[in-house]
Amino acid sequence: MPKYNLVSNVINQVDHKLGSNEPSGANKNILVAINGADSKLERKLSNIYSQFCKEYNFILGYSFTASRIVNKESINQILKPKHVFTEENLFDLNENIKLFDLLICPNITINTLSKVVSCNIDTYISNIIWASLYYDKPVYIDFENCKKFMSHETQNKFIKYKIDEKIKEIINMGAVEI
């Protein structure tokens, strides 16, 4: 599936899953989980914002690494979040999970993916993904970033196989690939 269809795929899946019984306007929130580096992240976030800003407010969740390496100021300007959560908010998970209607992971890493599918949920982002799946919230994940290490795809067939298996597992848990 071409990654250029990211936004339209999310919209179609969200519309289908949420249906027409959801509250309209500013009552709905999207948590965007930022996880590691991604050269296309700002473009992806701009597309997400332009498609969802009329119906949703945005909440940002940063992984430990992302909070230190991405341009948070630029991301905040793009999404205009009403809340921003970081690793320190791990202990507020029970309250955080109530604040959003759906989760979008535009740049999940293989580390986080592996943690969630192996039930090793020891970080804020792995916990928020796990809790969203556990409570049957819509979870949309772009797997492009987890297929790369230091911006390069592997030629090792077994590593590709292991990554594909983890992607299949999280999809079986309820996530939707975008």
Tell where the protein language model's regions lie, with residue ranges.
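A cross-family phosphate/adenosyl-ligand binding-site feature
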Residues: 1-124, 129-178
